[in-house]
């Protein structure tokens, strides 16, 4: 399936010089969304996975759909202050400052899911957060990997993705 044809390029958003990869058209296509849920993690033995952890906000959509498809739980990785206590928090650097994400503590094996991997800062923070909160990270996956911006791996494997730029 040609997923790139369902991802809209939005030039100069959110600021000049950036090309935003809008996955809204893909999400509106039930066949494409199902394809993503069934094919993004072909390399992972999901029998050992308890949860799909989605990074706010578009990662929520993908992870929740994948969790339902594979009959697993869903964990929200949220911006700080959005979840009731208790939570664990991790701060990380952004191009223009810092950010903080949080997750309820717990146990189990997770796959972390997000929409786009750019520099890897948010995804690495999510990995660190899951480990801090008591979870074991089985794999990480993104719909779109901007490979020209990163060479990120996890456990000596490339981050799973279905679309690369």
From Swiss-Prot:
Keywords noted in UniProt: Cytoplasm, Glycosyltransferase, Purine salvage, Transferase
GO CC, any one term: cytoplasm
CDD domains in the record: PRTases_typeI
InterPro entries per the UniProt record, alphabetical: Ade_phspho_trans, PRibTrfase_dom, PRTase-like, UPRTase/APRTase
EC code: 2.4.2.7
Gene Ontology molecular function, alphabetical: adenine binding; adenine phosphoribosyltransferase activity; AMP binding
Predominant place of localization: cytoplasm
Catalytic activity from the UniProt record: AMP + diphosphate = 5-phospho-alpha-D-ribose 1-diphosphate + adenine
Location relative to the cell: Cytoplasm
Pathway: Purine metabolism; AMP biosynthesis via salvage pathway; AMP from adenine: step 1/1
Coiled-coil features, chain-numbered ranges: none
SUPFAM superfamilies for this protein: PRTase-like
GO annotation, biological process: adenine salvage; AMP salvage; purine ribonucleoside salvage
Biological function: Catalyzes a salvage reaction resulting in the formation of AMP, that is energically less costly than de novo synthesis.
Family of the protein in this entry: Belongs to the purine/pyrimidine phosphoribosyltransferase family.
Annotated PANTHER family: ADENINE PHOSPHORIBOSYLTRANSFERASE
Subunit architecture: Homodimer.
Family matches, as NCBIfam families: PRK02304.1-5 (NF002636)
Protein name: Adenine phosphoribosyltransferase
């Amino acid at each position: 399936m040609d997923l790139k044809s369902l991802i809209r390029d939005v030039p100069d958003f959110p600021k000049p010089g950036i090309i935003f990869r809008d996955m809204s058209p893909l999400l509106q296509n039930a066949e494409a969304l199902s394809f993503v849920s069934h094919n993004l993690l072909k390399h992972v033995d999901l029998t050992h996975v308890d949860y799909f952890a989605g990074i706010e906000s578009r990662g929520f959509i993908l992870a929740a759909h994948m969790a339902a498809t594979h009959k697993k739980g869903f964990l929200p990785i949220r911006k700080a202050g959005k979840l009731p206590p208790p939570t664990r928090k991790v701060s990380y650097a952004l191009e223009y400052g810092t950010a903080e994400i949080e997750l309820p503590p717990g146990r189990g094996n997770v796959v972390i899911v997000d929409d786009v991997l750019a520099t890897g800062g948010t995804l690495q923070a999510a990995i660190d957060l899951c480990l801090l909160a008591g979870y074991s990270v089985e794999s990480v996956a993104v719909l779109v990997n901007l490979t020209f911006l990163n060479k990120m791996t996890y456990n000596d494997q490339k981050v799973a993705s279905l679309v690369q730029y």
